[in-house]
Amino acid sequence: MMEMAVAKEEKFPTAKRFDIADIQVSREATAVKPKVVANMIKRAKRPLLVTGGQLLKDEKLVEFAVKFAEKGIPIAATAGSSKPLIERGIKPVSKTYTLHQITQFLQDEEFQGFDGNGNYDTVIFLGFLPYYLSRMLSSLKHFSKITTIAIDEFYQPHAKFSFTNLTKDRELYYSMLQEVLDNL
């Protein structure tokens, strides 16, 4: 059985909150390894990658999002993040909504997905500012059955699963994203 949580002796930093004032959680996210993220995505019946505005500032995040799309993961791009994806030939299933609107759709039990084939069971988030994503993850945690996975460089306590806080080692963060993709 594969160990999920990040142990202190590993190359990954331990899970520490990026925003220490963000403490209103009854259960914190499990900090997970890249291979575990890949396995969760592979097991998902309806995965969705939601991309945020940080893609406009980080070309590598755009490249990773494109690779997720090439692996068959549909992308709901927030309005700003859709431009670099479309320029690379990616057709997001949604490209005009804000993260707030996407979150409202995902919470709606009658939502049939952006493609009309049913709601998503696993949603992965990439390219968001930590304080904005935190609020949306809290909402999804309390008002939906969706498995949420935060793969930004910030540990997100409101997600069900999250990368650990990687703000001090950008190259480790990129290598973790690549490891997820390599294992899909």
From Swiss-Prot:
Record InterPro entries: CdhB, DHS-like_NAD/FAD-binding_dom
GO biological process terms, semicolon-separated: methanogenesis, from acetate
Gene3D superfamilies named among the record's database cross-references: TPP-binding domain
Pfam families to which the protein is assigned, alphabetical: CO_dh
Highest taxon of source: Archaea
The protein's role, per its UniProt record: Part of a complex that catalyzes the reversible cleavage of acetyl-CoA, allowing autotrophic growth from CO(2). The alpha-epsilon subcomponent functions as a carbon monoxide dehydrogenase. The precise role of the epsilon subunit is unclear; it may have a stabilizing role within the alpha(2)epsilon(2) component and/or be involved in electron transfer to FAD during a potential FAD-mediated CO oxidation.
Annotated family: Belongs to the CdhB family.
Assembly behavior: Heterotetramer of two alpha and two epsilon subunits. The ACDS complex is made up of alpha, epsilon, beta, gamma and delta subunits with a probable stoichiometry of (alpha(2)epsilon(2))(4)-beta(8)-(gamma(1)delta(1))(8).
Name assigned to this protein: Acetyl-CoA decarbonylase/synthase complex subunit epsilon 1
Source species of the chain: Archaeoglobus fulgidus (strain ATCC 49558 / DSM 4304 / JCM 9628 / NBRC 100126 / VC-16)
Gene: cdhB1
